[in-house]
């Protein structure tokens, strides 16, 4: 997943690209840590956990606002980092009820999903690095898949089919795996990012990683608990 933008200062050398990659993955790592802290906070506060579970649409609005602002201020340091961390902390609160239900359904499954996600992240990132393929067409293809996935999730929310939820989880893993390869290729190989675009790149990869984790977790719990 990614945002529309025009690079400000194009990366011109291998050293500049290496710096961009370090800053991007550093921010991805910190964003994951902040998300874990957000979930830990919600899980330790019954009132916060209950509010997140009972008012998902309000939480979604609270989530999208800093994401939108982070996109708008993507090149304005330190505002870009502050907004990104606000977004990822709220994201942790937002997914906390799902983590709670998943762990109650199958104790230890959250850790298993995290390990599988990290393994998949490593393999897919390596594939994007070593492959000589041009992945530019993957973005539009998997974005269409994302729209279809979203529609299927809405339909299944009313139908309540466990089998449907399982299929949605499996497709969700594949869609975000494809988007992760695309966004990694875009960072490492495409030359689409400028020197100051590390926040845009990091948020795109973070969202791919997080959603892949959530769909893997849903798959491990039988597709019943995807929020």
Residue ranges and their predicted role:
Residues 1-227:
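A hydrophobic alpha-helical transmembrane-helix feature that marks the membrane cores
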């Amino acid at each position: 997943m990614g945002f529309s933008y025009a690079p400000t200062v194009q990366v011109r050398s291998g050293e500049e690209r290496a710096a961009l990659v370090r800053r991007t993955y550093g921010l991805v790592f910190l964003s994951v840590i902040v998300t874990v802290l957000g979930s830990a906070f919600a899980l330790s506060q019954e009132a916060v956990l209950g509010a997140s579970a009972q008012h998902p649409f309000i939480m979604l609005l609270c989530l999208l606002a800093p994401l939108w602002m982070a996109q708008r201020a993507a090149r304005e340091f330190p505002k870009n980092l502050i907004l990104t961390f606000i977004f990822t902390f709220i994201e942790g609160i937002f997914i906390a009820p799902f983590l709670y239900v998943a762990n109650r359904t199958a104790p230890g499954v959250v850790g298993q999903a995290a390990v599988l996600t990290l393994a998949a992240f490593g393999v897919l990132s390596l594939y994007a690095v070593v492959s000589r393929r041009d992945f530019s067409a993957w973005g539009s293809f998997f974005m269409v898949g994302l729209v279809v996935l979203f529609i299927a999730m809405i339909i299944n929310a009313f139908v309540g089919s466990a089998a449907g939820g399982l299929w949605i989880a499996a497709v969700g893993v594949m869609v975000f795996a494809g988007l992760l390869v695309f966004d990694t290729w875009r960072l490492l190989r495409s030359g689409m990012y400028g020197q100051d675009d590390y926040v845009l790149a990091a948020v795109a990869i973070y969202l791919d990683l997080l959603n892949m984790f959530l769909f893997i977790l849903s798959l491990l719990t039988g597709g019943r608990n995807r929020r």
